[in-house]
């Protein structure tokens, strides 16, 4: 059963404070996008990766990623939902699709493989999650607290999110695609979304502090690897 990973990469990165689209911000010697794609390929669970970027950036992204037989770069639309639609069209007859944020550039390949394993085991929709450690409040438009959800019932959602291709296509064909993640669209169809344990390294690099943390983690990883080599 074929698995295709879709990587929408058109976000402008306003909150990150960078001039470049955030997928093209440097992280440890290469772009965040290149790291995200590399993690997908290293998982051993993905047959093909489809990267969706603004049409005018297709050639430069191909140059950044290198020409690989298992990576396609296609033009997307103005909104993320338009880009995912373009990715679904490029996915062809894949049995499963994963949708992955380029900004989650440090996602461990093992987490990606676990999402695919859950799909192959029979789930139609799978998302990695982490327990919420902060207390969460709901507020009104004036900032007044309106409620406190039970923390034990809340989870922070990560990517890649995995789906049966037919299910995700049906969700996008249903019309209303206003949602903060693809799983929410699938939920509206009445499809059960299965959760699996996420990974702290799959955090989304959204703010300048996130970028500092990601770069520090990579430096630490490089130093540990060098120490290990010296100890041989």
Curated annotation (Swiss-Prot):
Keyword Magnesium found: no
Residue(s) at site: Transition state stabilizer: 15, 22
MF terms (GO), sorted A to Z: 2-C-methyl-D-erythritol 4-phosphate cytidylyltransferase activity
Pfam families: IspD
SUPFAM superfamilies per UniProt: Nucleotide-diphospho-sugar transferases
InterPro entries: IspD, IspD/TarI, IspD/TarI_cytidylyltransf_bact, ISPD_synthase_CS, Nucleotide-diphossugar_trans
GO terms classed as biological process: isopentenyl diphosphate biosynthetic process, methylerythritol 4-phosphate pathway
Entry EC number(s): 2.7.7.60
Xref: PANTHER family: 2-C-METHYL-D-ERYTHRITOL 4-PHOSPHATE CYTIDYLYLTRANSFERASE, CHLOROPLASTIC
Protein name: 2-C-methyl-D-erythritol 4-phosphate cytidylyltransferase
Organism: Rhodococcus erythropolis (strain PR4 / NBRC 100887)
Primary gene name: ispD
